[in-house]
């Protein structure tokens, strides 16, 4: 169980480092522009400080990652959340086994737990106040 939780933690850490939102400075046709770009959804961006917001498509613009980004608080927050989620998941399964619950009841509990995790994602991805 400990090895599984360790593997889960490390794999999620790798996913966060590769697939999380990236803050970029985009040098385009106009003045430099600060964007927050999601690598999860193609062409999904939000303008942070742009006088002329335009979509990024392909290699039309040079994208440079900000040098002063600090992802560790976000990574720690995600890892702690998923550690608590893993404990809740294991507790739910143990509770179902101990009480001899039917499979449908157990699946309803796990489904509810998954919905709660899904609803918590926007809160987890909120940036820390500076």
UniProtKB/Swiss-Prot annotation:
Plays a role in virus cell tropism, and may be required for efficient virus replication in macrophages. Keywords: Host membrane, Membrane, Transmembrane, Transmembrane helix. The keyword Transmembrane applies. The keyword DNA damage does not apply. It is a multi-pass membrane protein. This is Protein MGF 360-1L. Coiled coil: none annotated. It is found in: Host membrane. Belongs to the asfivirus MGF 110 family. The chain crosses the membrane at residues 4-24, 75-95, 109-129. GO terms for cellular component: host cell membrane; membrane.
